[in-house]
Design a protein with these regions (language model features):
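Active-site microenvironments that recognize anionic phosphate/pyrophosphate groups
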Residues: 1-160, 166-238, 260, 271-274, ...
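A contiguous, surface-exposed recognition patch within enzymatic or periplasmic domains that forms
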Residues: 230, 238-247, 251-255
């Protein structure tokens, strides 16, 4: 049992870890697993090749990664200039300017990122590198946020595999805070902060999920969610676009293996919110270390990690599981996707692949 506070050095906040609470009685809502018996093509899906979107624009007959401007953008350079703020000086407003894009991973409606071949995952990351380079060079763009929402329980409106890009005239708060923390650490210590986290995780070893020469994945000591996983290059790079070809190849392999292990845990399309933490683009940010954070909302099959009083009201996360225990579960499953012959949890007594849980 783990029952303590753990310091989150990137966010400068305490995470309450109380693993005994995961076994508490539960009479509340359970979420059903979304059906994965999906066809390869859906005629009325606005992301499938050749189909019309709500704007009337018809998608290309694409065969790989497909990128287009979002028909319902969060930010746009065509957004109107807001009216003057109230005159009392307390309230302020600002234009919501930027670029919103959708990135389809595959023409196949029935696949997820975890099911794509490694070469296709690499191709996606290369496409995202190109998007970052293009958008970060635009006047008025201060930050390029890339994220994927996967699964109905996180509010996804379409299961066709895709992510989104918001290139904005402001810096999203979490990234702004992380950039400040890492810059301050770099100025004070003369070295980046994130490699210290990597060193601590490798020295401990219990929370590691996947490793290659130039990249690794782990559930951090200070994880806020059950199964929250970081995927990072070993070298400090400010953005995905800064990774070398070999670094990107290892990063793609580690990311894919991590997502496969999550799916294999309960033999399902594991839901998550996945965010690329990249340095803002408006100026240099010394010491910023690009990485991906994966935030799965489930703590058990059918049971969500709800954000409630401590998180929403108090501002500190309460993790009902021990990161070491959750990492051990992911370590114990196959790195071959269950739809391709991989298994779920291994039988500890046999030390090999066993029946899926």
């Amino acid at each position: 049992m783990v029952w303590e506070q753990r310091w989150h050095p990137l966010r400068r906040e305490w995470v309450i870890v109380s693993s005994h609470r995961n076994e508490r009685p539960w009479l509340g809502e359970r979420v059903a697993e979304a059906a994965r018996q999906l066809p390869e093509y859906v005629p009325d899906c606005y992301l499938c090749p050749g189909n019309a979107r709500s704007s009337g624009t018809r998608n290309e007959q694409y065969g790989g990664v497909f990128v287009f401007d979002n028909d319902h953008p969060c930010v746009a350079f065509t957004a109107p200039v807001p009216p003057p703020a109230p005159p009392d000086g307390i309230y302020r407003n600002s234009p919501a300017h930027g670029v919103s894009r959708v990135v389809c991973y595959s023409p196949r409606h029935d696949l997820t990122l975890a099911q794509l071949p490694e070469a296709d995952v690499l191709g996606l990351l290369q496409a995202l590198q190109a998007q970052y380079r293009e958008l970060s060079a635009r006047a008025g763009v201060r930050h390029v946020l890339v994220f994927e929402n996967k699964g109905e329980v996180v509010g996804v409106s379409n299961p066709h595999p895709h992510c989104q890009i918001y290139a904005t005239n402001f810096v999203f708060k979490t990234i702004e805070s992380e950039a400040e923390v890492q810059a301050e650490y770099f100025a004070a210590q003369g070295r980046p902060l994130f490699p210290e986290i990597i060193h601590a995780e490798e020295a401990d070893g219990r929370r590691l999920i996947a490793r290659r020469e130039m990249a690794l994945a782990f559930i951090p000591y200070f994880a806020r969610y059950p199964y929250e996983t970081f995927v990072a290059p070993r070298a400090t790079r400010a953005s995905l676009a800064d990774l070398t070809a070999q670094e990107l190849q290892d990063f793609a392999a580690v990311l894919r293996e991590t997502l496969i292990r999550l799916d294999n845990l309960w033999r399902m399309a594991f839901p998550y919110v996945m965010v690329l933490h990249q340095a803002p683009t408006d100026r240099p940010y010394p010491g910023f270390h690009f990485h991906i954070e994966i935030h799965p909302p489930l703590r058990k099959p059918g049971l969500l990690k709800y954000l409630a009083g401590p998180e929403i009201g108090g501002g500190n996360f309460l993790n009902d599981t021990a990161p070491e225990e959750k990492a051990a579960e992911l370590q114990a499953v196959s790195n071959v996707h269950y739809t391709q012959g991989g298994e779920g949890r291994r039988r500890a007594a046999e030390g090999g692949d066993g029946e899926g849980s």
